[in-house]
Swiss-Prot record:
The active site is at residue 239. Belongs to the DHHC palmitoyltransferase family. ERF2/ZDHHC9 subfamily. Autopalmitoylated. This is Palmitoyltransferase ERF2. The gene is ERF2. It is a multi-pass membrane protein. The keyword rRNA-binding does not apply. It comes from Yarrowia lipolytica (strain CLIB 122 / E 150) (Yeast).
Length: 408
């Protein structure tokens, strides 16, 4: 079929010439079909577009993303740490053994046993308030576990201070290394500098370290996690049961989880004992006879003690180190930043003064234990000043902060 072409010469067309034939929708439709086919062939020759992937591939990359199937559109797709992102980057977890799923299953099974064997009789014969209070504590436990396990612990953005000289171990001229301090530590892949010095004492120093893996100067009390391969702000520890780091952003949820988990265990023990005693009185039996008729409360007592011991021990330990203004990482590694002893009391460094809200470099912790604990567990996590961007740079440098993973 021949198609209309514009005239090559000027002047009005003559009557009966092809130029004088009017162009209708029917005559232009084949041209439109040919143009679309031509565009599809051209796109196919250039390669598949990122939006032309199958629905199953796009759904899989949105639900469980390990490696991006196309060029990264969000910062979490260009993230270089050892993390797995879920539901379009809204949740994250370490790329280790998923023990957090096993812990969640144990919690749900223990709650299911309580609701199946102890709660119905307690609701009908003692008081409905007892299972209702347990439900509230149990929901707090599950919610705190999910928030601590799948949320951002305070991961610091990468590739901010791209200095090859620092990564090689050489120090720029604008910095000076304190005498007696090894500048470059190849075992930890860090470079240490004495950055701040308090005027009250020349011995109380706060050190900055350059992480050669993340290419950033870590702020005070931040540390690099070898399991997650990330620098975490106020890094406390890496919890294998959560399969995530515990840092500034999820520390309170971790403490809330272990506290409510221990309370659930003790609540199950107390309710099961009350169940046995009330059933004995109601049926006019001895304790041995009531246990033969209903042996499940005895099993729940054992499981409750087993599930409450370890969480309550963790609660006591973290309340103790929180009262000292320390983290688990600082307590285990004996960090000199937090281990200056003055008159038998641990001195407060510059970073601890920020936690306590005090500028006294040697304020005793015994005078403000409650203030330190409240500041550590209840302090507001300030929002980041940098805007949360949607797309990454062509080099994959992460400019935004970790406020929302779905836009990180």
């Amino acid at each position: 079929m021949d198609f209309y072409t514009p005239p090559t010469t000027a002047g009005p067309p003559t009557r009966g010439s092809p130029e004088s034939v009017p162009t209708t929708a029917a005559s232009t439709f084949p041209l439109r079909k040919r143009t679309r086919a031509h565009l599809r062939a051209r796109d196919k020759s250039d390669g598949p577009a990122p939006s032309s992937r199958g629905t199953s591939d796009r759904l899989w990359s949105w639900v469980f993303l390990k490696q991006p199937l196309s060029l990264p559109e969000h910062n979490y797709q260009a993230h270089l740490g050892n993390n797995v992102f879920l539901i379009g980057g809204r949740f994250l977890s370490a790329r280790q053994k998923p023990l957090n799923i096993a812990v969640l299953c144990v919690i749900l099974i223990l709650g299911g046993l309580y609701y199946g064997f102890v709660a119905p009789w307690t609701w009908n014969h003692i008081s409905p308030a007892i299972p209702a209070v347990f439900t509230y504590i149990f929901l707090l436990c599950v919610a705190s576990f999910l928030r601590a396990s799948f949320s951002d612990p305070g991961i610091l953005p990468r590739n901010i201070h791209l200095t090859d000289r620092i990564a090689d171990g050489s120090i720029p001229n604008e910095y000076s290394v304190e005498p007696g301090i090894d500048a470059f530590d190849p075992r930890k892949n860090t470079t240490s500098l004495s950055c701040f010095k308090q005027p009250e004492s020349s011995e109380n120093l706060v050190y900055l370290k350059y992480c050669s893996t993340c290419k950033i100067w870590r702020p005070p009390r931040a540390s690099h996690c070898s399991d997650c391969d990330n620098c975490v702000d106020f890094h406390d520890h890496h919890c294998i049961w959560l399969n995530n780091c515990v840092g500034r952003k999820n520390y309170r949820y971790f403490v809330a989880f272990v506290m409510t988990g221990g309370l659930c265990g003790l609540y199950i023990v107390g309710n099961s004992i009350a169940h046995v005693i009330c059933y004995k009185r109601h049926m006019h039996m001895t304790i041995a006879e009531s246990l033969r008729h209903r042996p499940m409360p005895l099993v729940m007592i054992f499981l409750g003690f087993l599930g409450a011991g370890y969480p309550l021990a963790l609660v006591g330990f973290h309340l103790w180190i929180a009262s000292r203004g320390e983290s688990t990482h600082e307590f285990v590694s004996m960090n000199p930043v937090t281990k200056h002893v003055v008159d038998g009391h641990v001195g407060v460094t510059l970073s601890k003064c920020k936690v306590m809200g005090s500028h006294d470099g040697f304020k005793r912790f015994s005078d403000a234990v409650l203030a330190v604990v409240c500041a550590r567990l209840c302090a507001h996590v300030s929002p980041h000043s940098n805007p949360v961007t949607k797309q990454t740079t062509p080099q994959g440098v992460q400019k935004s902060t970790f406020r929302h993973w779905k836009r990180f």
